[in-house]
From Swiss-Prot:
The gene is thi4. This is Thiamine thiazole synthase. GO terms for biological process: thiamine biosynthetic process; thiamine diphosphate biosynthetic process; thiazole biosynthetic process. Coiled coil: none annotated. Homooctamer; tetramer of dimers. It catalyses: hydrogen sulfide + glycine + NAD(+) = ADP-5-ethyl-4-methylthiazole-2-carboxylate + nicotinamide + 3 H2O + H(+).
Length: 267
C-alpha cells in the first residue's frame, strides 16, 4: 500500500502535546465536580453531570478506565445488569442479552468502552495516571472544596513531591471498596464527623438496592458513589452484578446537580 503521510518532527510533537495538556489542566483547575475513579459509578456520574452542563473532571489512577468492569467475573468477560439499570446501558448503546425477565448479560469490554465514550462525548474530562491523595477543606461553613493530586507514577516511585490542587464544588468518591477519598477526609478532618463502619460480606439481593438508596452526600461537598457507599455505610457487597453501580452514579449526579444549582455556586 502506498500512502503519503504528513511529516511531523519531534519538536512539534512535544510542543503540541504540552500546550494542549496544559490548557486542559488550566481550564479544569476550577471545576464544578471532581470524580475520583473511572469505574462504573464514576463514569455513570460523569455522563449525567456533564449532560447537565457541569464542568466535570474525572481522575483515574490507572492508565485505563472501567474499574472493576474489565475484570468481569473472576476474569470471565461477561457481567450481569438488572432492571432498571438496563435503561442507562441502552442510553449509551450497550447491547444486552436478556437471560430471564429483567436480567441481562453484557460484554465487559463493550460496557466500559461505551460508558466512557458517552461520558467524554457529554463533555466530561477523564485524566489517567493521577492519584487523589488528599482533599481541600474550608470552614464557615465546614466543607470539602477540592482535591490534592499527584502522578500515580510519582507515588509508585516513593518520591517526595508535593501535589497540586484542583478546586471543586463537589467531590465524588468513586474509588471502590476502600472509599479512599472519604477515608482520608474522615481521618484528617475529624470535624466532618464521618464514621466508616466498613463493607460487609456478600448479600447481592440486598446490596444492590441498599447501595443506590444510600448513595449521596457524606459531608458538605463530599459524596459517595458505587462501592464506596458500601464501605462508608456498612453495607454488603454484591459481586459481578453492576446495576447498582451505574444507578448509583446517576443518583449522585442528580443530587449534585440539584445541590449546585440550588446554591448557585457553579464555576
Amino acid at each position: 500500500m502506498e500512502v503519503k503521510i504528513k511529516q511531523v518532527d519531534e519538536v512539534k510533537i512535544s510542543r503540541y502535546i504540552i500546550k494542549e495538556t496544559m490548557e486542559d489542566w488550566y481550564q479544569f483547575v476550577e471545576s464544578d465536580v471532581v470524580i475520583v475513579g473511572a469505574g462504573p459509578s464514576g463514569l455513570s456520574a460523569a455522563y449525567y453531570l456533564a449532560k447537565a452542563g457541569l464542568k466535570t473532571l474525572v481522575f483515574e489512577r490507572r492508565l485505563s478506565f472501567g474499574g472493576g468492569i474489565g475484570g468481569g467475573a473472576m476474569l470471565f468477560h461477561k457481567l450481569i445488569i438488572e432492571k432498571p439499570a438496563d435503561e442507562i446501558l441502552r442510553e449509551v448503546n450497550v447491547r444486552l442479552k436478556e437471560v430471564e425477565e429483567g436480567v441481562y448479560v453484557v460484554d465487559s469490554a463493550e460496557f466500559m468502552a461505551k460508558l466512557a465514550t458517552a461520558a467524554i462525548d457529554a463533555g466530561a474530562k477523564i485524566i489517567h495516571g493521577v492519584t487523589v491523595d488528599d482533599v481541600i477543606f474550608r470552614e464557615n461553613p465546614l466543607r470539602v472544596a477540592g482535591v490534592a493530586v499527584e502522578w500515580t507514577a510519582t507515588q509508585m516511585a516513593s518520591l517526595h513531591v508535593d501535589p497540586i490542587f484542583i478546586s471543586a464544588k463537589a467531590v465524588v468518591d468513586a474509588t471502590g471498596h476502600d472509599a479512599e477519598v472519604i477515608s482520608v477526609a474522615a481521618r484528617k478532618i475529624p470535624e466532618l464527623g464521618i464514621v466508616i463502619p466498613g463493607e460487609k460480606s456478600a448479600y447481592s439481593e440486598r446490596a444492590e438496592e441498599l447501595t443506590v438508596i444510600n448513595t449521596g452526600k457524606v459531608a458538605e461537598g463530599l459524596y459517595a458513589a458505587g462501592m464506596a457507599v458500601t464501605e462508608v455505610k456498612g453495607l454488603p457487597r454484591m459481586g459481578p452484578i453492576f446495576g447498582a453501580m451505574v444507578l448509583s452514579g446517576k443518583a449522585v449526579a442528580e443530587e449534585i446537580t440539584k445541590d449546585l444549582l440550588k446554591s448557585e455556586i457553579r464555576t
